[in-house]
């Protein structure tokens, strides 16, 4: 990787809200791509039911997702600077949690929490970039997953319609595909290749 790209990737901290099927893969993709500062936020523990689509292993069952994922990421790149927070995001704490992050990847499960997070962060920070994900449930239709600029500093990855309530299941390939869109966009924004 060119030195100027490495320098750019070392200057931005990326916050990831939610470390399930989306967030765990986003973090792994960014770490492998050379992003040096990651901020991992989740309140949950790894459950055996997560293993079919999230970036965890049997040995991680019962552990905090933040701790298990941080350990994996440091095994990929021991020079990473990782901040972890084991908290549930709320309207009261979300703005403060992401204060030092230049790019925020929203990867939470609940539509209500997604909406709260987007609204809270936009109200607090006009200059931060928010990458949200919506519409990744089910299988197939890979090309339906898109990355769209919704407004200044707000991007949406997914097909915008395939939820667990309509598709009945989440699958590793579609979750990872949407996560790859989010991570690829974050990289492009950091490197100045996308506006």
Describe each region flagged by the PLM.
Residues 1-195:
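Adenine nucleotide-associated cytosolic modules
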